[in-house]
Amino acid sequence: MAREFSLENTRNIGIMAHIDAGKTTATERILYYTGRIHKIGETHEGASQMDWMEQEQERGITITSAATTAQWKGHRVNIIDTPGHVDFTVEVERSLRVLDGAVAVLDAQSGVEPQTETVWRQATTYGVPRIVFVNKMDKIGADFLYSVGTIHDRLQANAHPIQLPIGAEDEFNGIIDLVEECAYMYGNDLGTDIQRVEIPEEHKELAEEYRGKLIEAVAELDEEMMMKYLEGEEITVEELKAGIRKATTSVEFFPVICGSAFKNKGVQILLDAVIDYLPSPLDVPAIKGTLPDTDEEVERKSSDEEPFSALAFKIMTDPYVGKLTFFRVYSGVLNSGSYVKNSTKGKRERVGRILQMHANSREEISTVYAGDIAAAVGLKDTTTGDTLCDEKSLVILESMEFPEPVISVAIEPKSKADQDKMGTALSKLSEEDPTFRAHTDQETGQTIIAGMGELHLDIIVDRMRREFKVEANVGAPQVAYRETFRAAAKVEGKFARQSGGRGQFGHVWIEFEPNEEGKGFEFENKIVGGVVPREYIPAVGAGLEDALKNGVLAGYPVVDIKAALVDGSYHDVDSSEMAFKIAASMALKAAVSKCNPVILEPMMKVEVVIPEEYMGDIMGDVTSRRGRVEGMEARGNAQVVRAMVPLSEMFGYATSLRSNTQGRGTFSMVFDHYEEVPKSVSEEIIKKNKGE
């Protein structure tokens, strides 16, 4: 089967936003107008095409990014709908890694919200070009220019409107196109009756002012246009479009458009903007990778002629076909039934069938080309972030980095029958989601699951019940504390057992010191003159790594420290790797008294939105939870409080906020960083963990 759409006419885009800004509805409408759905599903009725898991339909939020493909004006648009809820950041991170461009959806009443900032940061990390769609223009309190202002203030992004709304709230009935200098008026709410008209008289002045600002902003990034602009020459529509496209694809400029997906206004113009301004796979830099044997860096161009390479970015378990591996093809061509190499794991895999996904229905295809996104059936060993490539031309593409879980709960099956099923369920779920971990606690024998937040773990337990029929009891959430050292010291660890027969002997001197935040554990060998033989040195490092898993104060993992092996001694007969491992862990225990160990706790960036009259109560409540208020602002007729609060103090906050504001307050939180626990709290944690 020949290629249906050329690479230049392919767009791989993500739709990203804060929860409830209306992303899924926007995606639905795109599928409706591109002829993929015959009836529109509403999220708030639980009938949306993209939200296909039962819990998504019940909760009205998107959890897994469904990948789907649509066609518009001779172009193929592959869309990944990403979740906006903070607990699912990994889904967003995964999608952004394989996209070429994104549409950031904002709520016209709130503008940029905390999760928008997180997602925006992730997109900046991966260098993803973006268009901003200010949605919900029909909502009470909708304010387009306020929303644009929040993009400048909170994201420090060079964003400029390329459209202006005509009216707002109930009066929102048209859109001014600043590039083409015309207006589109909507005759009905189905979005089918659109008239292209001249800009209404009363809006002309504003339109001229903003078109001037737009040209100036684009000209600043384009020398030729700048010369024309300064000489007062007319800049044509084509030149302006080309200028916007160039600046957008190089991530220096973000066009802002408006509409109301729910009321079917502005969606077709959004699709036009995706085609006009977001990059094709040819416009983005070629993907970089390394050769497995030499670690030499290589590039794979987006072309069918290059050897095949692809990145697996999501694993899903499908009730009918089993394990689905979603992948993005960066170069070359892949036929179903062929063999590929998983270069990350060094395994050979057979691609049984290739499916093109459409929210939750699928169509089987025989070939995928460079730039395509599809799902493969039959891959056994491939997990998220693995590279698939041609067996004759190996390459490992840059993988993705995922955050560590911040919250854990103990979970136990209700019956013996559930016990076995639970193991299978947990391993399948952790295969799908790299930020979800499950392990057995060595001391208590309990199964512990860990994730990115309470909602994340709720949904995992819920999926165990629905998809794997496992009933389980869940304990109270536990915070993922960490420990670290604040002072440097040189300590000794000596393990000697020499009572007849073969003994054990290991002896080390280790210098511990604090490391930079986020750098983790670093081990250095500074032994001179072989006082500790070379073959035992890895054992010292391994012994320390093992010992660091259970910290010295309260048994939490120790992070961000440096250890240098500086001296020691050995015995010709009695020394062994095991003895040096034990000596190293003894040195770590000895460091407690000298290195000033402290406990660290996860701090959450919290944003609370409340009516003015509850301000005092909420501020008091935040402070009582050891929170630091970092800023306040008015947003429409509500107040927004931004604060840093320890995760341990945020359990049950939703209930307390509801009762403090009679259900009128909302909040969202995002993990930010680890911080030292105050002395009094630290003592309590130590007591609790020692069972006192």
Curated annotation (Swiss-Prot):
GO biological process: ribosome disassembly
Gene it is expressed from: fusA
Keywords of this entry: Cytoplasm, Elongation factor, GTP-binding, Nucleotide-binding, Protein biosynthesis
Family classification: Belongs to the TRAFAC class translation factor GTPase superfamily. Classic translation factor GTPase family. EF-G/EF-2 subfamily.
GO cellular component: cytoplasm
Species: Bacillus cereus (strain ZK / E33L)
Name the record gives this protein: Elongation factor G
Subcellular location: Cytoplasm
Cited function: Catalyzes the GTP-dependent ribosomal translocation step during translation elongation. During this step, the ribosome changes from the pre-translocational (PRE) to the post-translocational (POST) state as the newly formed A-site-bound peptidyl-tRNA and P-site-bound deacylated tRNA move to the P and E sites, respectively. Catalyzes the coordinated movement of the two tRNA molecules, the mRNA and conformational changes in the ribosome.
Entry GO MF terms: GTP binding; GTPase activity; translation elongation factor activity
Domain tr-type G: 8-282
Pfam families: EFG_C, EFG_III, EFG_IV, GTP_EFTU, GTP_EFTU_D2
Binding site for GTP: 17-24, 81-85, 135-138
Main location: cytoplasm
Keyword rRNA processing part of the UniProt annotation: no
CDD domains named among the record's database cross-references: EF-G, EFG_III, EFG_mtEFG1_IV, EFG_mtEFG_C, EFG_mtEFG_II
